[in-house]
Amino acid sequence: VSRVWIADPLASDGAQIVERDEKPGGPAQNLLTPQPTETWTVVPGPDREARVVFDLGAATPVRLAFLGYTNATATTQWRIRASDLVDGFDATSFWADGSTWGDASTWAGGFNSGFVDVWPTTGLGTWDRVHGFLKIDPIQTFRFWELTIQVAPGEEDSVFTAGRLYLGDPWEPPINMTPGASIGFNDASLVRRTPFGRLHTGTRGQWRRMVFVLQNSDEDLLFTETARLDRLRGTSRDVLVVKDIDRPSLLMEQSVYGVFGELDPVVIPEPANVFVRRFQIQEWERP
Protein backbone atom coordinates (compact mmCIF):
# COMPACT_ATOMS: atom_id res chain seq x y z
CA VAL A 1 0.00 0.00 0.00
CA SER A 2 1.40 3.38 -0.99
CA ARG A 3 1.36 6.33 1.35
CA VAL A 4 -0.94 9.28 0.81
CA TRP A 5 0.11 11.94 -1.70
CA ILE A 6 -0.81 15.60 -1.22
CA ALA A 7 -0.18 17.56 -4.41
CA ASP A 8 -0.33 21.24 -5.28
CA PRO A 9 -0.12 22.84 -8.75
CA LEU A 10 2.55 25.45 -8.04
CA ALA A 11 5.09 24.03 -10.51
CA SER A 12 2.73 23.73 -13.46
CA ASP A 13 0.51 26.75 -12.79
CA GLY A 14 3.51 29.01 -13.38
CA ALA A 15 4.22 27.43 -16.76
CA GLN A 16 4.25 29.20 -20.09
CA ILE A 17 2.47 27.39 -22.92
CA VAL A 18 4.78 27.33 -25.92
CA GLU A 19 2.77 25.10 -28.27
CA ARG A 20 -0.87 24.11 -28.24
CA ASP A 21 -3.81 22.64 -30.09
CA GLU A 22 -7.10 24.20 -29.00
CA LYS A 23 -10.50 25.45 -30.10
CA PRO A 24 -11.67 29.07 -29.71
CA GLY A 25 -13.30 29.45 -26.33
CA GLY A 26 -11.42 26.50 -24.87
CA PRO A 27 -7.79 27.60 -24.50
CA ALA A 28 -5.14 25.29 -23.10
CA GLN A 29 -4.49 27.95 -20.46
CA ASN A 30 -7.66 26.73 -18.74
CA LEU A 31 -5.71 23.64 -17.66
CA LEU A 32 -3.69 25.90 -15.36
CA THR A 33 -6.62 27.45 -13.49
CA PRO A 34 -8.71 25.85 -10.71
CA GLN A 35 -12.09 26.03 -12.43
CA PRO A 36 -12.67 22.58 -13.96
CA THR A 37 -15.78 23.70 -15.87
CA GLU A 38 -13.56 26.10 -17.84
CA THR A 39 -11.91 23.52 -20.05
CA TRP A 40 -9.22 22.98 -22.59
CA THR A 41 -11.26 22.08 -25.65
CA VAL A 42 -9.84 20.52 -28.79
CA VAL A 43 -10.79 18.45 -31.83
CA PRO A 44 -7.91 16.00 -32.50
CA GLY A 45 -8.29 15.92 -36.30
CA PRO A 46 -7.00 13.39 -38.86
CA ASP A 47 -3.98 12.24 -36.83
CA ARG A 48 -6.27 11.62 -33.81
CA GLU A 49 -3.88 13.56 -31.53
CA ALA A 50 -3.84 16.90 -29.73
CA ARG A 51 -1.00 18.29 -27.66
CA VAL A 52 0.18 21.09 -25.41
CA VAL A 53 3.80 21.90 -24.52
CA PHE A 54 4.53 23.59 -21.19
CA ASP A 55 7.67 25.51 -20.23
CA LEU A 56 8.10 25.25 -16.45
CA GLY A 57 10.83 27.90 -16.54
CA ALA A 58 13.56 25.64 -15.18
CA ALA A 59 14.29 21.95 -14.82
CA THR A 60 11.57 20.82 -12.42
CA PRO A 61 11.11 17.45 -10.71
CA VAL A 62 7.82 15.79 -11.68
CA ARG A 63 6.51 12.59 -10.14
CA LEU A 64 2.80 13.03 -10.80
CA ALA A 65 0.82 14.07 -13.85
CA PHE A 66 -2.88 14.61 -13.17
CA LEU A 67 -5.41 15.44 -15.88
CA GLY A 68 -8.72 16.16 -14.21
CA TYR A 69 -12.34 16.48 -15.28
CA THR A 70 -11.96 14.98 -18.75
CA ASN A 71 -14.62 13.61 -21.07
CA ALA A 72 -12.26 10.78 -22.03
CA THR A 73 -13.83 7.53 -23.15
CA ALA A 74 -12.54 4.06 -22.32
CA THR A 75 -10.38 4.19 -25.47
CA THR A 76 -8.84 7.65 -24.99
CA GLN A 77 -5.11 7.59 -24.24
CA TRP A 78 -2.57 10.17 -23.16
CA ARG A 79 1.19 10.52 -23.14
CA ILE A 80 3.61 12.68 -21.16
CA ARG A 81 7.03 13.52 -22.62
CA ALA A 82 9.75 15.78 -21.23
CA SER A 83 12.89 17.46 -22.53
CA ASP A 84 15.35 20.20 -21.66
CA LEU A 85 15.09 21.54 -25.24
CA VAL A 86 12.16 23.62 -26.44
CA ASP A 87 12.21 21.71 -29.74
CA GLY A 88 12.85 18.42 -27.98
CA PHE A 89 9.55 16.95 -29.15
CA ASP A 90 10.36 17.33 -32.84
CA ALA A 91 11.50 13.85 -33.85
CA THR A 92 13.66 15.27 -36.63
CA SER A 93 15.73 17.44 -34.33
CA PHE A 94 15.73 15.92 -30.87
CA TRP A 95 18.62 13.52 -31.34
CA ALA A 96 22.00 14.54 -32.66
CA ASP A 97 22.28 11.22 -34.51
CA GLY A 98 18.88 11.68 -36.15
CA SER A 99 17.09 8.99 -34.14
CA THR A 100 13.54 9.68 -32.99
CA TRP A 101 11.30 9.16 -30.01
CA GLY A 102 10.25 5.53 -29.87
CA ASP A 103 8.07 3.49 -27.56
CA ALA A 104 10.64 3.17 -24.78
CA SER A 105 9.71 4.95 -21.57
CA THR A 106 12.99 6.79 -21.10
CA TRP A 107 15.89 8.03 -23.20
CA ALA A 108 19.26 9.52 -22.38
CA GLY A 109 17.98 12.99 -23.28
CA GLY A 110 14.33 12.95 -22.25
CA PHE A 111 11.31 11.14 -20.86
CA ASN A 112 8.47 9.43 -22.70
CA SER A 113 5.70 7.66 -20.84
CA GLY A 114 4.29 6.12 -24.00
CA PHE A 115 0.55 6.18 -24.60
CA VAL A 116 -1.53 4.85 -21.70
CA ASP A 117 -5.26 4.90 -20.98
CA VAL A 118 -6.64 8.07 -19.41
CA TRP A 119 -9.05 5.92 -17.40
CA PRO A 120 -7.08 4.52 -14.43
CA THR A 121 -9.25 1.40 -14.49
CA THR A 122 -12.18 -0.04 -16.42
CA GLY A 123 -15.84 0.48 -15.61
CA LEU A 124 -15.79 4.24 -14.97
CA GLY A 125 -18.74 4.97 -17.24
CA THR A 126 -20.87 5.97 -14.24
CA TRP A 127 -18.73 9.07 -13.70
CA ASP A 128 -19.70 12.19 -15.65
CA ARG A 129 -16.03 13.09 -16.04
CA VAL A 130 -12.93 11.03 -15.40
CA HIS A 131 -9.54 11.95 -13.94
CA GLY A 132 -6.29 10.65 -15.39
CA PHE A 133 -3.36 9.85 -13.07
CA LEU A 134 0.19 9.07 -14.17
CA LYS A 135 2.84 8.11 -11.64
CA ILE A 136 6.26 8.99 -13.06
CA ASP A 137 8.68 6.58 -11.45
CA PRO A 138 11.52 7.26 -11.14
CA ILE A 139 10.96 10.97 -10.78
CA GLN A 140 11.99 13.03 -13.83
CA THR A 141 13.49 16.52 -13.87
CA PHE A 142 13.09 18.54 -17.07
CA ARG A 143 12.05 22.03 -18.12
CA PHE A 144 9.68 21.34 -21.02
CA TRP A 145 6.74 18.96 -20.65
CA GLU A 146 4.39 17.81 -23.39
CA LEU A 147 0.86 16.47 -22.92
CA THR A 148 -0.61 14.55 -25.88
CA ILE A 149 -4.13 13.16 -26.15
CA GLN A 150 -4.89 10.35 -28.60
CA VAL A 151 -8.43 9.26 -29.44
CA ALA A 152 -9.57 6.03 -31.06
CA PRO A 153 -10.13 5.65 -34.81
CA GLY A 154 -13.48 7.14 -35.72
CA GLU A 155 -13.30 9.74 -32.93
CA GLU A 156 -10.93 12.16 -34.67
CA ASP A 157 -13.72 14.71 -35.16
CA SER A 158 -15.02 14.44 -31.61
CA VAL A 159 -14.49 17.17 -29.03
CA PHE A 160 -12.11 16.40 -26.17
CA THR A 161 -12.20 18.46 -22.99
CA ALA A 162 -10.17 18.55 -19.77
CA GLY A 163 -10.46 20.94 -16.84
CA ARG A 164 -7.27 20.76 -14.76
CA LEU A 165 -3.62 19.74 -15.07
CA TYR A 166 -1.06 19.11 -12.34
CA LEU A 167 2.61 18.44 -13.04
CA GLY A 168 4.74 18.24 -9.93
CA ASP A 169 6.24 16.34 -7.05
CA PRO A 170 3.59 15.73 -4.38
CA TRP A 171 4.35 15.55 -0.69
CA GLU A 172 4.46 11.93 0.40
CA PRO A 173 4.70 11.81 4.20
CA PRO A 174 6.93 8.97 5.42
CA ILE A 175 4.00 7.89 7.58
CA ASN A 176 0.60 6.85 6.28
CA MET A 177 -2.87 7.85 7.41
CA THR A 178 -3.83 6.57 10.83
CA PRO A 179 -6.77 4.13 10.98
CA GLY A 180 -10.14 5.86 10.83
CA ALA A 181 -9.72 7.93 7.66
CA SER A 182 -12.99 8.55 5.85
CA ILE A 183 -14.03 9.34 2.28
CA GLY A 184 -17.64 9.86 1.29
CA PHE A 185 -20.26 12.02 -0.36
CA ASN A 186 -21.94 15.08 1.11
CA ASP A 187 -25.43 15.78 -0.19
CA ALA A 188 -27.02 19.15 0.59
CA SER A 189 -30.36 18.30 -1.01
CA LEU A 190 -33.42 19.57 0.83
CA VAL A 191 -35.82 16.94 2.13
CA ARG A 192 -38.94 17.74 4.12
CA ARG A 193 -42.27 16.13 4.80
CA THR A 194 -45.54 18.05 4.71
CA PRO A 195 -48.11 17.89 7.53
CA PHE A 196 -50.00 15.44 5.32
CA GLY A 197 -47.06 13.06 5.16
CA ARG A 198 -46.00 13.87 1.61
CA LEU A 199 -42.29 14.10 0.92
CA HIS A 200 -40.86 17.08 -0.95
CA THR A 201 -37.26 17.17 -2.12
CA GLY A 202 -35.02 19.80 -3.63
CA THR A 203 -32.04 18.19 -5.31
CA ARG A 204 -28.68 19.88 -4.92
CA GLY A 205 -25.23 18.88 -6.01
CA GLN A 206 -23.16 16.26 -4.25
CA TRP A 207 -19.49 16.48 -3.44
CA ARG A 208 -17.02 14.26 -1.66
CA ARG A 209 -15.16 14.92 1.56
CA MET A 210 -12.01 13.23 2.85
CA VAL A 211 -10.84 13.35 6.46
CA PHE A 212 -7.63 11.77 7.69
CA VAL A 213 -4.97 12.11 10.38
CA LEU A 214 -1.18 11.97 10.27
CA GLN A 215 0.70 11.50 13.51
CA ASN A 216 4.36 11.08 14.35
CA SER A 217 6.87 11.83 17.07
CA ASP A 218 9.02 13.80 14.59
CA GLU A 219 8.14 17.47 15.11
CA ASP A 220 9.83 18.65 11.91
CA LEU A 221 7.92 16.12 9.83
CA LEU A 222 4.51 17.56 10.52
CA PHE A 223 5.26 21.22 11.14
CA THR A 224 7.47 21.97 8.14
CA GLU A 225 5.37 20.64 5.28
CA THR A 226 1.95 21.31 6.79
CA ALA A 227 2.94 24.93 7.44
CA ARG A 228 3.95 25.24 3.79
CA LEU A 229 0.63 23.84 2.60
CA ASP A 230 -1.36 26.03 4.97
CA ARG A 231 0.52 29.15 3.94
CA LEU A 232 0.44 28.56 0.19
CA ARG A 233 -2.94 26.84 -0.28
CA GLY A 234 -5.08 27.98 2.65
CA THR A 235 -8.75 27.06 2.32
CA SER A 236 -9.35 28.67 -1.08
CA ARG A 237 -6.58 27.33 -3.33
CA ASP A 238 -6.83 23.87 -4.83
CA VAL A 239 -5.00 20.73 -3.79
CA LEU A 240 -5.18 17.08 -4.78
CA VAL A 241 -5.11 14.22 -2.28
CA VAL A 242 -4.47 10.69 -3.56
CA LYS A 243 -4.90 7.94 -1.00
CA ASP A 244 -3.00 5.23 -2.90
CA ILE A 245 -1.46 6.02 -6.30
CA ASP A 246 -0.63 2.34 -6.83
CA ARG A 247 -4.23 1.13 -6.60
CA PRO A 248 -5.80 2.06 -9.96
CA SER A 249 -9.06 0.24 -9.23
CA LEU A 250 -9.95 2.88 -6.60
CA LEU A 251 -8.11 5.97 -7.83
CA MET A 252 -11.31 7.76 -8.80
CA GLU A 253 -13.12 6.87 -5.58
CA GLN A 254 -10.22 7.54 -3.22
CA SER A 255 -8.70 10.71 -4.71
CA VAL A 256 -10.18 14.14 -4.08
CA TYR A 257 -9.43 17.36 -5.96
CA GLY A 258 -10.61 20.36 -3.98
CA VAL A 259 -9.69 22.65 -1.10
CA PHE A 260 -8.87 22.17 2.55
CA GLY A 261 -12.10 22.49 4.52
CA GLU A 262 -10.29 23.75 7.60
CA LEU A 263 -6.69 24.37 8.60
CA ASP A 264 -6.49 22.24 11.71
CA PRO A 265 -3.56 22.98 14.03
CA VAL A 266 -0.85 20.48 14.84
CA VAL A 267 -1.77 19.05 18.23
CA ILE A 268 0.80 17.89 20.79
CA PRO A 269 -0.94 15.49 23.18
CA GLU A 270 0.68 15.18 26.58
CA PRO A 271 2.53 13.24 27.79
CA ALA A 272 2.91 11.09 24.67
CA ASN A 273 4.83 13.73 22.70
CA VAL A 274 3.17 12.55 19.49
CA PHE A 275 2.37 15.30 17.01
CA VAL A 276 -1.04 14.98 15.35
CA ARG A 277 -2.44 16.79 12.32
CA ARG A 278 -5.96 16.32 11.03
CA PHE A 279 -6.69 17.06 7.37
CA GLN A 280 -10.02 17.80 5.75
CA ILE A 281 -10.47 18.26 2.02
CA GLN A 282 -13.73 18.99 0.26
CA GLU A 283 -14.21 18.34 -3.43
CA TRP A 284 -14.23 21.32 -5.78
CA GLU A 285 -16.90 19.80 -7.98
CA ARG A 286 -18.12 16.26 -8.47
CA PRO A 287 -16.58 14.71 -11.58
What do these predicted ranges mean?
Residues 1-50, 55-287:
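Extracellular/virion structural assembly segments
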